[in-house]
């Protein structure tokens, strides 16, 4: 782990989320794809110099509410499973995805937060 674990975790999560088949980014690209996962680091804590707990909000956009919830559920499952095999992320916890409409777009969004243990 380097001095800034948030910088390390985004590439690791992007790799873990590749099987979703949708773009994974920290920004919403222009033009916006029909389906998208955005990762937003939201902080965390560090118990020791070698251990950190990093929080990331995961937002999944899709054309329908059901598709957004399904994409978020898939992302959640991949993150929880990926923590078992990733070199950086050694444990993951995640809230359940919830629908969270995006009034600025015609897309539908579901979101959840994950806490990652990084050694």
Predicted regions and their residues:
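Charged, amphipathic alpha-helical segments and their flanking helix caps
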Residues: 1-22, 40-119
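Short acidic low-complexity segments
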Residues: 24-31
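A short, hydrophobic beta-strand-centered structural micro-motif
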Residues: 32-41
């Amino acid at each position: 782990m380097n001095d800034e674990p948030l910088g390390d975790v985004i590439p690791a999560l992007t790799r873990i989320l590749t099987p979703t088949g949708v773009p994974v980014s920290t920004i919403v690209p222009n033009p916006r794809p029909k389906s998208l996962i955005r990762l937003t680091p939201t902080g965390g804590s560090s118990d020791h110099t070698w251990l950190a707990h990093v929080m990331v909000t995961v937002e999944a956009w899709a054309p329908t509410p059901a598709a957004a919830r399904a994409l978020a559920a898939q992302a959640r499952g991949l993150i929880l499973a990926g923590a078992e095999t990733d070199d950086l992320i050694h444990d993951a916890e995640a809230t359940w995805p919830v629908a969270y409409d995006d009034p600025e777009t015609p897309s539908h969004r579901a979101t959840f937060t994950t806490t990652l243990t990084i050694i």
